[in-house]
């Protein structure tokens, strides 16, 4: 083909290079040089195109591709070169790059999407919990609870006196802690430490032997300041009843053994495989410097703990980290600028780990809304106590910490469930935005209650809502542990996703796994229907499919600070994509939530296959 084109150009040039009367020899020479340059340039272009085609290792064609790229939302085909996307377009355009060495993947009209991103997932902590005795948030009767825990303990081979931990306990168990005490403070449990970790990861129940290890007794409770008294539940006589909230949980978990490298690697492998099976090729881990044996809610400012971060390094060293991980470091409520410098030393330890970034910090502004914890900070009051919940740091302290982090170029991700915590978080971001326009995609996560006056502030301040919309359903949590204790307006206004979107906010999708399932298809279903086992929750706040697909692709990637390489299918981005088993744009909502990922690719390589 190249030779035919050159022959045509040569014949054309000979006609033009004939002497022209009146113009002399110089014009003939000019034509010769011009045609020579055209031939050279054309030959180089064809050679370059040929070389590029030779290196296109895979072409996907005959498909339907949702790109999450606003400039080219849909396509038929995609070419992959060296693990990156070389081109996206029609079958005709992309198949032009085919050579004898190119692998062709006929999509047979199936849908392809970017690899999904989860903007808030405790992936390693969740895996450690899954690999341990786990109640899976199930509400069970006391006989079943006792039977399961006794069975797990016998299977564990735990030595006497070694703390035994059961994960995934439904917080409804804490409603009457004396019932737990009657079972697990007698017989073997009188000397055997037991910790039931709440499925919300904010609450727990410890038996007497476990409280003894932590030094929590009557005297300890009596010496707590008024600000701290809410972290430990007490009986009518003022003795600890075993219920622990936020920093109270830390008092016990710091006495748990830290997982060794073998366990961290096993948990990491579990987490990566599970996420890849759901089509997830990236996530933001919001507490990478915390884990068993380390404090989370009451971290000391000088802490240099690395938490579960080594798990990601171990995976990467084995070539098994087939996901982008943006790992955040939890900052102490007492943190200042100096503490951010110390956190930087932790970041530097993992600076060269492939597929791992540490873009910033996570701040806990408050706790959770559910009874009996009720530690989420409200503008109003809880009906039963008349209290407003707790801010974990002062308004001024939050402003200073956010401002200092923004100045250092750190992404800031704030946990805020109550409307007072959300408002004060926005106030803090407003200070930083007024001082400088860093452009960093800061975010607030959870957002169970938001003052309607604050809806427009997210867009105005360029703050992303990172929402776990699997929670936007009517279930026992809302009916039994929330509804009786807050006013009707607040109850029906929970998780105001559509209101935030209508006011210009860009929503990112997240799971908060293991607090709820990591399955993004179920979460998107809940966001689109707001249906739950016990009815619907304010269906005016439903979101559409396109919004949710963007929330779990390019918007989540932006929230995690990885949108330069992931989150959409566009030229130059890493080739992270999935193939699904059904037409997600046409099936019913019930069918959508059962979507299965047939294949997941990371950097152009197949990392998961259903079959």
Place the predicted regions along the sequence by residue.
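Acidic (Asp/Glu)-rich catalytic clusters
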Residues: 347-352, 459
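Bacterial N-terminal signal peptides that target proteins for export
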Residues: 20, 24-36
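Sec/Tat signal peptide C-region and signal peptidase I cleavage site
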Residues: 49-52
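His/Asp/Glu-enriched, well-ordered alpha-helical/loop segment
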Residues: 403-413, 420-442, 452, 456, ...
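Bacterial N-terminal signal peptides
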Residues: 37-45
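Non-cysteine beta-strand/loop elements that form the S-adenosyl-L-methionine
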Residues: 356-369, 463-473
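Divalent metal-binding segments
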Residues: 54-61, 66, 70-344, 359, ...
